Amino acid sequence: MTTKGPESEHPSVTLFRQYLRICTVQPNPDYGSAVTFLEERARQLGLSCQKIEVAPGYVITVLTWPGTNPLLHSILLNSHTDVVPVFKEHWHHDPFEAFKDSEGYIYARGAQDMKSVSIQYLEAVRRLKSEGHRFPRTIHMTFVPDEEVGGHKGMELFVKRPEFQALRAGFALDEGLANPTDAFTVFYSERSPWWIRVTSTGKPGHASRFIEDTAAEKLHKVVNSILAFREKERQRLQANPHLKEGAVTSVNLTKLEGGVAYNVVPATMSACFDFRVAPDVDMKAFEKQLQSWCQEAGEGVTFEFAQKFTEPRMTPTDDTDPWWAAFSGACKEMNLTLEPEIFPAATDSRYIRAVGIPALGFSPMNRTPVLLHDHNERLHEAVFLRGVDIYTRLVAALASVPALPGES
């Protein structure tokens, strides 16, 4: 790919880089500057701007372009404003400089996840408005905080508020992932995050003795049971070339805690696990399996949830569904190859789907390595600009979906 010099940079790219320079990095994001940036975008685009504080210091910004038929449900274009932490020593360039190299690659935290999509929404609406378009359905763009740490002070609270109900959303778009091939990945569901702490209690004593019924022995049994399950799921994924990672349940041991000294057998030890539960799993049965593994290890072994999501929904991806037909039809007109998948991690889409609103996760980045959360996260400006073109067509198609049963 080639790129133009800085004197002829596309205005959409300049805006993208400006947004990337706002340091909304966890654990102390500069949300205030992001909101100010979005307020200015609303003013320039002639859109209404609503700010909803769902928790102290956590503001959701909603930009709205009214449709011509208020009886129809709206289109929700969702993105999050926060980004994950960085290890600057591993970056070729300052991750908050939005440096663009001679080939056109823009290096910045958030370049893929997901400030690119936020600006693509805004630029798609700007283009459609400047061309004089009006659509039957209202378009809301929501910019939410806290997604990278679970969304508990963001979308999870927002969907329960009257301001969200007032948006009357009928369909939503949210983030996806890059695809290194020619195809574009679209996500219609996602795995449920279960963060679990297993605690084992046993007999303490001097470490020179063979003590029976120790916390470590019993915790070891649970760890073995869970890792055996992990291996079974890993082999199931590897054995079936048609399965994607999001279709199986993953688990990783992420933390071990316990002990006070080298020569003291601890009375308590714990292990933390990050499960990502596939949407077709029987949640109640799986929780009973966890209980069984703890019981089999012996007395005094329990588990608790640090995070538990149990309402996975799947957005239809067949042509009888009007939303999918509009989305996939627009992609077909652009000769885009779609690969529908289950998102392997978690996004704010899970909260949107849980309240009955179909949602697709889509970040238009093909021929691009997946670099979210990675060192040297980057996106080529040509890929970004094509994404603006793609979202312009998608927004127009979705906002033009005719009235559905019950809407008029």
Curated annotation (Swiss-Prot):
The active site is at D82, E147 (proton acceptor). Zn(2+) 1 binds at H80, D113, E175. Zn(2+) 2 binds at D113, E148, H373. The N-terminus is blocked. GO terms for cellular component: cytoplasm; extracellular exosome. It catalyses: an N-acyl-L-amino acid + H2O = an L-alpha-amino acid + a carboxylate; an N-acetyl-L-cysteine-S-conjugate + H2O = an S-substituted L-cysteine + acetate. Its EC number is 3.5.1.14. Its cofactor is Zn(2+). Pfam families: M20_dimer, Peptidase_M20. GO terms for molecular function: aminoacylase activity; identical protein binding; metal ion binding. InterPro entries: Aminoacylase-1_M20A, ArgE/DapE_CS, Bact_exopeptidase_dim_dom, N-acyl_aa_amidohydrolase, Peptidase_M20, Peptidase_M20_dimer. Keywords: Cytoplasm, Hydrolase, Metal-binding, Phosphoprotein, Zinc. It is found in: Cytoplasm. It comes from the Eukaryota. Binds 2 Zn(2+) ions per subunit. The modification Phosphoserine is found at S408. Its main location: cytoplasm. Homodimer. Belongs to the peptidase M20A family. Involved in the hydrolysis of N-acylated or N-acetylated amino acids (except L-aspartate). This is Aminoacylase-1A. It comes from Rattus norvegicus.
